Design a protein with these regions (language model features):
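Short glycine-aspartate micro-motif
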Residues: 2-6, 56, 123-127
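Phosphate-binding/catalytic loop of phosphoryl-transfer enzymes
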Residues: 78-82, 88-162
Length: 193
């Protein structure tokens, strides 16, 4: 089975695939202080009972990627591994001024979007994470660029800190996209939009 690891600034998402079928997935907090051994203890507990045939990793957190490399070399050295990072050939042309600045997550998203949806025309990929990424993919599967903005949680936190009459609210999906004239539900509507 193929274990995929997507290390984001806030969460790490792991998926276990049998060919193209997702068998299991997990979402865990990303902690850049974790050591290779701590990562292995966590990953081993999740994949226990599954036979790994491959590993694919992308990370936007250099400290975690460094520890993942160590973990892989110590505990999974016999498993074929692909780490998406600048310089790795993915088949995605990066038509931007500095391709090395494009995060691995955005490259993988481009590849997936084109494979799944892009054969008939261009597409826009929206990734709601610590930052909200909007990326444009050409009909040929080329990464054309995009826009980055603060993610939902950061936006809500910033509003609570910078707007005198707004407070931090729990990020839950409200009943309606239109808030019910209370600032709490109006801020939560941000999640729905």
């Amino acid at each position: 089975m193929l274990l995929t690891v997507d290390v984001g600034n806030t969460n790490t998402v792991l998926g276990l695939f049998d060919k193209e079928r997702l068998v299991q997935s997990w979402r865990v907090k990303t902690d850049p202080r974790d050591t290779a051994d701590e990562l292995w203890l966590l990953y081993r507990s999740l994949i226990d009972g599954f036979e790994l045939t491959g590993l694919a990793v992308c990370s936007t957190v250099p400290a975690v990627l460094r520890e993942l490399r160590t973990m892989i070399s110590h505990y999974l050295s016999d498993i074929p591994t692909t780490i998406i990072e600048p310089g790795v050939k993915t088949g995605v042309p990066l038509l931007v001024d500095n391709p090395k600045e494009i995060g691995a997550d955005r490259i993988v998203n481009t590849l997936a979007a084109h494979s799944l949806y892009g054969k008939n025309g261009p597409c826009i990929v929206v990734d709601f994470g610590t930052s909200t990424n909007l990326d444009v993919v050409s009909p040929k599967g080329e990464f054309l660029g995009g826009a980055l903005a603060a993610g939902i949680e950061i936006s809500v936190d910033a509003l609570a800190q910078r707007a005198a009459q707004l407070r931090k609210v729990e990020l839950v999906v409200p009943r309606s996209v239109i808030g019910d004239r209370k600032s709490t539900s109006e801020l939560q509507s941000h999640v729905r939009i």
